[in-house]
Amino acid sequence: TRDCDENQYDFIMSVGGDGTLNEVISGMVDSHKKIPLCILAAGTVNDFANYLNIPNSVNGIVEMIKNFNVISSDVGKINNQYFINVAAAGMFSDISFVVSKEEKKKFGPLAYYFKGMTQLPQQLSTNLHLNVTVDDESFEEDAYIFAITNTNRVGGFDGIIPFADIN
């Protein structure tokens, strides 16, 4: 993504899940790419793609590319890391990083729930002290989980943040 020449391509395609999409977005933002992004949802949960109702059938994907519709989306940044769907810390926020490819292949989205249940005792002891600064305003707070989201889908759950909007 970082090295592509925008003048040679009509769009960049992200093939994978939310993690892959985040990596592609990070490369695009870091290198100031203004080329459209096409999402092929091939991950386990695909929260961002599902929020956008991106098809996952071959025919649906072909139609999507033929009738390419460009939309804008905000991209967030926390501690020099970009995110397009969600940035989280605290309880259960590390689950997506500890579920193996084998577990995802065998159990699909349930792999995340199984892993979360096995780690519940450790997760209950998770506590964060947050120092948040937005523009010129700051506040401190203790919390079990902290999340900023661009859509209403997080961890395969729909409607978590009803008023979330990608732009």
Go through the PLM ranges and name each one.
Residues 23-25, 49-50, 157-158:
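Short glycine-/acidic-enriched loop or helix-start segments at secondary-structure transitions
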Residues 1-15, 22, 26-27, 31, ...:
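ATP/NTP phosphate-donor binding region
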Residues 103-111, 153-155, 162-167:
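Gly/Ser/Thr-rich active-site loops/lids in small-molecule metabolic enzymes
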Residues 88, 92, 147-163:
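Glycine-rich phosphate/pyrophosphate-binding beta-alpha loops
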Residues 30-145:
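Catalytic core of DAGKc-family lipid kinases
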